[in-house]
Amino acid sequence: MSKRTEQLGHEIQRILGEVIQYELKDPRVGFATVVGVEVTADLQIARVRISVMGTPDERRETMAALERARGFLRRRLAEELNYLRFVPELRLILDTSVDYSLHIDELLRRAAEERADSPPQQPEDDKPAE
């Protein structure tokens, strides 16, 4: 990724985050956060990773509402990024990495609890000879 596409990705992330949080009035949009944007080298496509808190149904509903608002989001980007000739097409992607990390944390917590609850076992080699 070139420095230009990386900078543009950060700028798109900032703008979309603010627009989704403060300007989008759709009540179906739950707690959504733009966690990253990858812009193609030709600046035609921006893959926008979005994390949504809530149940699977709430996530689907939020992503569907954001898909319907894609035109509005792109129009707001065009207003903010007026130095670009073309505004990238937005591809909205549900990011589940936060869920995965929470799942891993839970597994590690359980393993630590199980280890604390079970008595330490003596290795076979350390047992006294009879």
Curated annotation (Swiss-Prot):
GO terms for biological process: maturation of SSU-rRNA. It comes from Roseiflexus sp. (strain RS-1). Keywords: Cytoplasm, Ribosome biogenesis. Belongs to the RbfA family. PANTHER family: RIBOSOME-BINDING FACTOR A, CHLOROPLASTIC-RELATED. InterPro entries: KH_dom-like_a/b, RbfA, RbfA_dom_sf. It is found in: Cytoplasm. One of several proteins that assist in the late maturation steps of the functional core of the 30S ribosomal subunit. Associates with free 30S ribosomal subunits (but not with 30S subunits that are part of 70S ribosomes or polysomes). Required for efficient processing of 16S rRNA. May interact with the 5'-terminal helix region of 16S rRNA. This is Ribosome-binding factor A. The gene is rbfA. GO terms for molecular function: ribosomal small subunit binding. GO terms for cellular component: cytosol. The keyword Cytoplasm applies. The keyword NAD does not apply. Monomer. Binds 30S ribosomal subunits, but not 50S ribosomal subunits or 70S ribosomes. It comes from the Bacteria. Pfam families: RBFA. NCBIfam families: rbfA.
